[in-house]
Every structure is written in structure tokens, then in C-alpha cells.
Amino acid sequence: MSFAPIPELLEEIRAGRMVVIVDDEDRENEGDLIMAAELVRPSDINFMVTHARGLVCLSVTRERTAQLGLTPMVQKNTAQFHTNFTVSIEAAEGVTTGISAHDRAHTIRTAIQPNARPSDLTQPGHIFPLTAQP
């Protein structure tokens, strides 16, 4: 199997397209659909949940985690890979049940706004933030 060079992947992401990032076979041995959060559309979420069938996550920096007042999902993370899940989120306004592709895309766009505040989100929700580990 051949892999695309990183500059090509970055160009695809900048253009609003999804790419598949594959981790090591000695880790989870899986692929994740990755795209720029600021460009996510309901059709992208629909594709993810229809074809990838996993959780819809949002990678956030430590600074953004603090800005949004997100706390770890658990106090003691005993998961095999210690993935930094925070509590799940939903946009406080502009959503119905939160589960639709429209609602999830709206929640992501709400959470990444430069001036986003904790009051812009409710918990729990249908988007699962992951605090990035640099």
C-alpha cells in the first residue's frame, strides 16, 4: 500500500477534503478520517457516521480545552492508549436533538470559534473532544 506525502495531505485538508490517517499496526491498527474542523459540513459528518461508523471527535489544543472549560471524561484514565477524551459537547444554541449531521457540524463550528466560551456548549453531547498531546 502506498501513502500520500504529508504536503499532499495538508493540501487536501486545506481544500476541505477528508484524508485517512492510519496509525501503526502495533497500536490500534486503524484509520481515522481527518478534516479541517472549520470547513466541516453536515454532508461530511453524514459521510463519517455512514462509512466510518465510529465516534465523531474534535481534536483541540490544551489552550482550547481550558478556554471551553472542558474537563477530562474520567478522573483516572485507564484506557490502553490513555486517549485524552474530555466530556462530550453539544452547541447550546442552534441544534435540536444534537445527533443529526447538521447539529454535530454546528457543534464543531461553535466549539472552534475564536471567541467560544463554556456557555456556548452543553454537556454531555454528541461530539467527543480530544485534547491533543503535542
Place the predicted regions along the sequence by residue.
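Catalytic domains of riboflavin
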Residues: 1-134
